[in-house]
């Protein structure tokens, strides 16, 4: 079993000025800090190709008999997109949890994205820098899922 955790953050000032739609025209500055609340990723590798995801906090449960047959279903968009982006091909049981509710404004989606990229890269045996983790999580959220994240 592998456990990953990543902190969420709170914005003190400048929230929204980190969005390209704003800062490309006006510049931007954000004052944030992480807090002692986290997202959690728990992975159990499987000997078969089955993929199962469960998250009471992100309100999802999904099973695919083969990891190659993953499809985007409501609540699985982020983990499935990251697994496909990283080209991970082995079966797993994936449990996602968070100390804060989705859409709380504390960056739980971004925290979860960073967490998933870090854990799945580790499973693949890939060495990835913090900067690459940040860039990859931003790419998946903004360019693949078209989510408005800063």
Range-by-range predicted roles:
Residues 109:
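Short, conserved phosphate/pyrophosphate- and ester-handling motifs at nucleotide-, phospho-/glycolipid
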Residues 128-150:
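Alpha/beta catalytic cores of group-transfer enzymes, especially the acyltransferase/condensing modules
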Residues 115:
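Active-site signature of alpha/beta-hydrolase-fold catalytic machinery across serine-
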Residues 1-106, 118-128:
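ATP-binding N-lobe of GHMP and related small-molecule kinases
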């Amino acid at each position: 079993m592998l456990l990953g955790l990543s902190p969420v953050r709170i914005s003190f000032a400048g929230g929204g000025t980190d969005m390209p739609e704003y800062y490309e025209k006006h510049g931007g500055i954000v004052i944030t800090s992480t807090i002692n609340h986290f997202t959690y990723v728990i992975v159990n590798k499987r000997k078969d190709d089955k993929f199962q995801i469960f998250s009471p906090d992100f309100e999802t449960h999904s099973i695919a008999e083969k990891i190659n047959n993953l499809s985007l279903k409501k609540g699985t968009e982020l983990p499935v997109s990251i697994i496909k982006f990283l080209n991970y091909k082995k079966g797993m049981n994936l449990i996602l949890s968070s100390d804060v509710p989705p859409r709380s404004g504390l960056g739980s989606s971004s925290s979860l994205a960073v967490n998933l990229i870090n854990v799945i890269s580790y499973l693949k045996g890939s060495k990835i820098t913090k900067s690459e983790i940040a860039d990859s999580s931003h790419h998946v959220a903004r360019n693949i899922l078209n989510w408005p994240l800063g």
